[in-house]
């Protein structure tokens, strides 16, 4: 798919059960692209193969971006494990290369932060890798601030960058 086509016709919606396989593929492809494979990375999370079920109840939401029947990526929010009830985590925000640079990351972020506020969260936390510069740029553009150490108990010991945003 041409990146300009993705920009023109991509739409966002909540994840559906039939998206699970395609979203798992996106996660695995992007994590592998950035060398984030193995223990300590979200690629190993059990929810990767069942994203719809993982984000369909409680105070969580997951959104996918798609165009012309192709799932380009997604992002979600959920309570941060091991943290206060008012803290959510931005989780599994990944876009395939053909979905990048078209504003889809910004649209996904806006949707996730709106959902976080609607669900009553007051702080959004995320974990990433220092070398994921485009992602870090997006997070900074939204006002996320670096932390010196992780928050909560995500189990993602492979991440080396932690950020928060007051909602």
Residue ranges: model-predicted function:
Residues 7-97, 109-111, 115, 150-152, ...:
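Acetyl-CoA-dependent GNAT
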């Amino acid at each position: 798919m041409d990146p300009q086509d993705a920009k023109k016709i991509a739409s966002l919606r909540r994840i559906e059960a039939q998206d699970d396989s395609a979203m798992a593929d996106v996660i695995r492809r992007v994590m592998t692209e950035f060398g984030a494979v193995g223990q300590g990375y979200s690629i190993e999370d059990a929810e990767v193969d069942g994203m719809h079920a993982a984000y369909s109840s409680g105070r969580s939401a997951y959104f996918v971006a798609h165009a012309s029947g192709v799932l380009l990526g997604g992002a979600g929010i959920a309570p941060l494990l091991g943290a206060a009830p008012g803290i959510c985590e931005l989780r599994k925000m990944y876009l395939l290369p053909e979905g990048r640079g078209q504003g889809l990351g910004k649209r996904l972020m806006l949707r996730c932060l709106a959902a976080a506020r609607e669900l009553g969260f007051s702080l959004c936390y995320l974990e990433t890798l220092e070398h994921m510069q485009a992602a870090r740029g997006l997070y900074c553009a939204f006002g996320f601030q670096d932390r010196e150490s992780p928050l909560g108990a995500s189990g993602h010991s492979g991440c080396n960058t932690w950020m928060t945003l007051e909602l």
